[in-house]
């Protein structure tokens, strides 16, 4: 089985400037293995100008601490994500090492990603809300029953380049791909979407617990109502599945789930 890294993505401006979508716990490994992310000869930090966050999951945010040596960072996220990162001490810890410019991301409002010097890049993001009715465990732990926000805990992003009008969608956590969410996937050239679990009862089948995929905020891939068939009925866009749990049989290179996904996603 090939080694897998977390679901962090890098978005380039075509001129060497890079922005990250989320920041996983193994970010330091990814930085070492990706030459475009190496510091230049006159720079002690990687050429990463900012990070846009889909949520406050540790799988998506612990890598922020790997960037603590940066002179300054632009971080984009919703108000709910900022509160959660402050409560779990990730954000205060990062702020004790470097200057963090927090930019509030509001669903439905497009914004340009900024370079470290504050000038806008040609790369833009447009967040859309993907908060489900049942919050993920990390979010439930920080909100008393009935007090959780109804939006902004989880978002996806449409990511584009003002020079080319090409668009990608980044949605690594989604509990239900309903009609509202599917509209944001239209006219995209690439879709990166949640592949945490292959089936809804995967943890039970693997004797790893009783929670279902949907109860944890993740739509399963397989099945008549799974994300694979749902997306294929509505788009022929190239699909990349991301954020795989270690129980997911799609990890096995020649297994039936991998073959079925490969035939459907290309």
Name every feature range the model reports, one short phrase each.
Residues 69-71, 80-104, 247:
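Active-site neighborhood of divalent metal-dependent phosphoester bond hydrolases
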Residues 76, 101-106, 126, 265:
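General small-molecule cofactor/ligand-binding pocket signal
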């Amino acid at each position: 089985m090939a080694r897998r890294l977390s679901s962090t993505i890098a978005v380039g401006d075509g001129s060497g400037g890079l922005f990250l979508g989320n920041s996983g716990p193994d970010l330091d490994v990814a930085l070492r293995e990706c030459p475009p992310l190496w510091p230049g000869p006159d720079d002690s930090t990687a050429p990463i100008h900012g990070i846009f966050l889909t949520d406050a999951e540790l799988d998506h945010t612990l890598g922020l601490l790997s960037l603590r040596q940066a002179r300054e960072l632009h971080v984009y996220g919703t108000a709910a994500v900022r509160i959660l990162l402050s409560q779990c001490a990730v954000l205060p810890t990062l702020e004790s090492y470097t200057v963090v410019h927090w930019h509030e991301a509001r669903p439905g409002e497009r914004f340009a990603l900024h370079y470290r010097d504050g000038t806008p890049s040609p790369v833009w993001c447009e967040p859309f809300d993907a908060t489900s009715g049942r919050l993920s465990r990390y979010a439930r732990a920080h909100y008393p029953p009935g007090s959780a926000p109804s939006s902004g805990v989880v978002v996806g992003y449409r990511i584009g380049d003002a020079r080319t009008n090409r668009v990608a969608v980044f949605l690594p956590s989604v509990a239900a791909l309903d009609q509202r969410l599917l509209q944001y996937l239209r006219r995209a050239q690439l879709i990166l979407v949640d592949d945490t679990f292959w089936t809804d009862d995967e943890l039970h089948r693997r004797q790893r617990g009783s929670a279902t995929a949907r109860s944890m905020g993740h739509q399963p891939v397989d099945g008549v109502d799974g994300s694979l068939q749902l997306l294929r009925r509505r788009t022929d866009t190239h699909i990349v599945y991301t954020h795989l749990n270690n129980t997911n049989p799609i990890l096995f290179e020649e297994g039936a789930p991998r073959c079925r996904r490969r035939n459907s996603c290309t």
